[in-house]
């Protein structure tokens, strides 16, 4: 990042955390009416600074961080009364949303004319589950009640080209992951990378209709009609054509990866996609990738290498 870019980011940071803006935000969401020592500006900056500078395990860490930053002696009870307000969550959500939106900039790219250079965004989607205190099981029920009675899931949408999240949503662990996929229209001239938990053929059809692309891990047990079949070395597998996938599954090659052109009927319309299949020697099972990226521009090996980018969202 050069001096000009650093200067621009510094200006944005000062604007996002400016006193008038944060205080107005607190008033707008009805977090506070009268501003005393714990103003929205002071609280927002203290919370951000504390998270950025130390591990945070309890509310007391934020309380100490506030007093240290502003040189105050606010009691724990007074501090707790502010963050316990129902509107505090709205204030924190709005502040975080503005921070992500304003501080995100494009940091990665591709040479013009090369693969993936034509996409406006490369979107990564993921959901991560965390166990929390069992006392919260009624509000945040876990999927695996015997092991994790209470759990939450963090749904994250990330733009790889900006190397930053664009949407972060916290829900009970039982919430359906697919509800947090980007709107199909937002993926025009973009490509979505996601794990198999997000596979929804109706959604993929809408993405394709909107001019979007996807590369998503598929599930075992699918049964589309196989239209074409090629081995990794380019050999056409004529014996696998024009049959349901389940009918040929036992005869799929294991020494080489396979590319199939498959078709489903979705909402009374054909959905034709590329299904890439590889054999995992360690787990003794096939792995599947589903995409609508054109085969001539994006050959099999490139697709597998591109899917590795999805791990970037795991380390956010």
What are these regions, as identified by a protein language model?
Residues 104-111:
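Primarily marks folded extracellular/lumenal domains of secretory and cell-surface proteins
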Residues 1-59, 65, 74, 78-81, ...:
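Single, function-defining residue in the core of a domain
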Residues 71:
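Long, low-complexity, charge-dense
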């Amino acid at each position: 990042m050069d001096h000009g870019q650093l200067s621009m980011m510094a200006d944005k940071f000062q604007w996002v955390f400016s006193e008038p803006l944060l205080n107005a935000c607190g008033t707008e969401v009805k977090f506070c009416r009268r501003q005393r020592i714990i103003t929205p500006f002071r609280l927002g900056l203290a919370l951000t600074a504390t998270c950025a500078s130390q591990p945070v395990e309890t509310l007391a860490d934020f309380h100490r961080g506030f007093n240290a930053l502003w040189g105050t002696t606010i009691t724990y009870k007074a501090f707790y009364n502010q963050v316990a307000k129902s509107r505090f969550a709205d204030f924190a959500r709005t502040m975080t949303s503005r921070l992500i939106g304003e501080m995100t900039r494009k940091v990665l790219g591709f040479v013009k004319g090369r693969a993936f250079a034509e996409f406006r965004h490369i979107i990564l989607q993921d959901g991560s589950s965390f166990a929390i205190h069992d006392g919260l099981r009624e509000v945040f029920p876990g999927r695996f009640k015997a092991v994790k009675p209470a759990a939450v899931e963090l749904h994250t949408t990330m733009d790889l080209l900006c190397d930053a999240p664009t949407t972060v949503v916290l829900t009970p662990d039982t919430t359906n992951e697919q509800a947090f996929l980007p709107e199909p229209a937002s993926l025009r001239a973009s490509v979505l990378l996601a794990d198999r938990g997000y596979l929804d053929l109706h959604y993929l059809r809408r993405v394709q209709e909107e001019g979007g692309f996807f590369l998503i891990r598929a599930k075992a047990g699918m049964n589309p009609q196989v239209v074409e079949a090629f081995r990794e070395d380019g050999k056409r597998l004529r014996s696998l054509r024009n049959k349901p996938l389940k009918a040929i599954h036992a005869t799929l090659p294991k020494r080489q990866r396979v590319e199939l052109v498959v078709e489903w009927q979705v909402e009374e319309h054909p959905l034709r996609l590329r299904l890439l299949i590889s054999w995992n020697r360690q787990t003794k099972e096939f792995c599947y990738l589903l995409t609508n990226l054109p085969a001539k521009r994006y050959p099999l090996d490139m697709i597998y290498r591109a899917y590795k980018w999805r791990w970037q969202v795991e380390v956010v």
